[in-house]
Amino acid sequence: MLERSGAMLWGRTTYEMMRGYWPAVARGEIDAADAERDWAIKLDAIPKYVVSSSRTEYPWANSHRLDGDLRTAVQDLKAATPEGVLLGSVTLAAELDRLDLIDEYLFLVHPRIAGHGPTLFESGLPRTRRLDLISAQPMSNGVCVMHYRRAD
């Protein structure tokens, strides 16, 4: 997924959570499997854009604040990133869906059942969203990657 994307887009909370772990993995400061370290190095190199009204500093390599009107800023980012923008933030995903700014969805289903925490589209959507399945791929770690395109 990361190899096929030109940028990451996160909300502040997701950025802070990711920044607290992955740069240290990339630098070899945290023991991790080779596949995790490789992913961390790729994540370190890719441009990362953050939507935040409160955070002003972005010390992680290649991290930038996405400024201005959300719709316009995301449209501009998508236009400037032909490889695609990979979104990873529950709250931001719901807002971008409401603004009709998500073209495709990659859902990663992990072999775990969480008893708490945020859920995708927790606050709902204005209408049912029809999707067309592009692919479904099981990974060696038990995760299933499901790729959908908007049908409407």
Task: Indicate where each model-derived feature is located.
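Enzymes that bind and transform nitrogen-containing heteroaromatic metabolites
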Residues: M1-D152
